[in-house]
Every structure is written in C-alpha cells, then in structure tokens.
Amino acid sequence: MAHELDVSPSDRERPGSPPVVAPRSVDLARWCASRGWPVHPLAPGRKTPTANCERCRQPGHTHKGCACIQAGRWCHGFHAATLDFARIEQWWFNHPGLGVGVACGPAHLVVIDIDAHRQQPPDRDRLLPGIPIPRSVDLGGLANGFHTLGVLAALRGAVSPADDETTLRVRTPSGGLHVWYRAHGSHRWQCSAGSSSTRALAWQVDVRANGGYIVAPGTTTVAGTYTAVGPAREPAALPDWLARELARTGHLPPRASPT
C-alpha cells in the first residue's frame, strides 16, 4: 500500500503524507490515528457519522456511560472516536465502505471550514461579527467564505488561511476548503457555524474544534473526494492572529483566554 499512500516503504508504520489517491479506508484511518487523531466511522458515501444502534437512538440516551462505546462499537459519532489500532482494524476491515472522521477536540485540532455556497450575503454587520464595515466600503463581488475570511485577514495584516501553504488544506467536493491547525496548549476552542447569530468567525466560515469532527483527507463520498492541496501535509500551529480572532468571537469557554 506504500504507493497508494505516497510514502516510502520504510515509512509504512507511520505514513508521511495523506493519500494522493483514494486509499482503503482502513489505511486512511490508521494514518490519522498514527498522528494522534482519534477516528470514527462515517456512513458509506456520506460525510455524516454512522447511525446509532436501535437502543442508542432512544430519546434521552446519550454517549455518557454508553455501553456500546465501552464495548468498542461506533455509536454516538465522534464520541466513539479511538486511537486503538485493533479497533480500527476491526471497524474498517469488516466494513470497508465506511468513511473516516476525525474528532477535533481530542486531536487538538482547530479546522477552519470555508464554504463556497451560492447564497445572498447577509447585511454587512453579519459578515464579520463584531467588526463594523463602513458603508463606504464596496462589497460588490463578495459571495462566499473565501471572500469574508480574506477581508478579515487583510484587516489584520495577515495571510488568509485559505492561502496558508504552511498547513494542511483539504479541498472539499463542494468547492470549499478545510484548513487544519494544531490548537495551542490546553485551549479548548469551541465549534461554530458561520451563519450563527451567537458565535461565528465570519459568514460562510465554520470552525471545527471541541464538540465536532472533520472529514479526513482522502475520504470519498458520493459527491467526490476530500483532497489535500498545496505542499503541506501536516497541520501547522494555529496562527496567533487567528487565535485572537477566535477568542474575540467567543470560541473559548468563559474565563479562558489565549496566551
């Protein structure tokens, strides 16, 4: 499988790059786990977790203390994510059609999920929460998360994460981009949706962190394959300016702040 994973034969136990062609899911899951990223199955051909068993679907049942997770089953999505290679082999060898998800929180990852959906932009005060955009600024042509994130980065004198070649970036089948970063120390960054009125980094820019998961590069759905782009194949440290913006927009629990 070395040629499929774009690694040398001597590096098979810890592949050095995510797949450049669609690999077997078990190899992809092992590649992620070898980096300390807990993995969990996604439904075949989809980007959502596999369904719970009948008992775990009952109202009021949660992942806390769930016997299924304790027994090594995959109920409750990213809550069942594991680094156990024996469990990984069992899950994906027996069910090779499953996709691979990565639990962001325990993996200490913050992933900037940039969307490119065709939508009418909201009022300018919703484009960059907490940052007023004067009426004198022409927003003609602004159409998606690539644009709003680019504006935010420009205001801070920084490179947009979409153009950050120092870190792992993954093109999504819908034309979006997942930009992977390593979280700072013990900070527990929180998830958000770019459309949220309570916590958001920018319009059409989601944040995947604690309490969420991300589709692993190399995973294939009915819509296409999540493909790593650019030279980097590992997440870089979360840039300081971006950490400050995440803190400013409420992505840390109360009484926590970045150093």
Feature-to-residue mapping (PLM):
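Conserved phosphate/metal-binding and DNA-contacting active-site motifs used
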Residues: 2-258
